[in-house]
Amino acid sequence: MLANTTPNNQHENIPGNPSTSKNSDVALRTTATADTLRVLTIEQWNFWKEYGYVVIKNAVPREQAERTANFLWEFEEKDAGNKETWYTPPRAKMEMKELVGTGMVEVYNNQHLWNNRQMEKVYDAFVDIWGTKKLWVTIDRANLNFPMPSGSEYKGFIHWDYDPETKPQNVQGVLALADQDEDTGGFQCIPWLFKNYDTWKLTQPEDRNHFKPDTTGLEDKIV
């Protein structure tokens, strides 16, 4: 067991994922060649460098994704075939009130999640991004989202899980357990903001929210 080395629980009053809020002196890889990449193609690598995100298909076997999804249904005491169970209150209390109603599932260390984290293709993808085999797993929760009920005003929100001013920069991965298209799924990003962050931030007020950017005027750039 590792001792808590975060002084005075300094993450208590800020949003985001504490496991990505700080990192070591290791910086993300800056260059690569086809023969040094394990999972990414050189085209995917160039896309990653240009747009700040990349999609790795079939990162885990479909059967394993289904087992994980079935576990989440069971953990939340909901039935995929019974819509009446979908919108019942979550089982666990959400400490981060801004996440209430967003489908977050308060499970972190179940073996299904660890099986996914330790898949060779998942590991190798991060080796490609970081440029090192010495990786430390960040721990995060799962998500079980449903179609928004009629009359709901909630909209997904673009956010960072750590302050982008953190240097060296960090990186996260999101594992989709079901097929997604333009109209479904929980992940959104703004590649334009990735490419233009340093100039964009100069247009923002000094007291801007470092975790939830003002995306006014960027709506057409969300993917």
Region locations from a protein language model:
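Non-heme Fe(II)-dependent double-stranded beta-helix
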Residues: 2-50, 57-165
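Short, well-ordered beta-to-alpha junction loops that form the rim of enzyme active sites
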Residues: 139-141, 176, 192
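Short, conserved beta-strand element in jelly-roll/cupin
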Residues: 163-182
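Double-stranded beta-helix
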Residues: 180-223
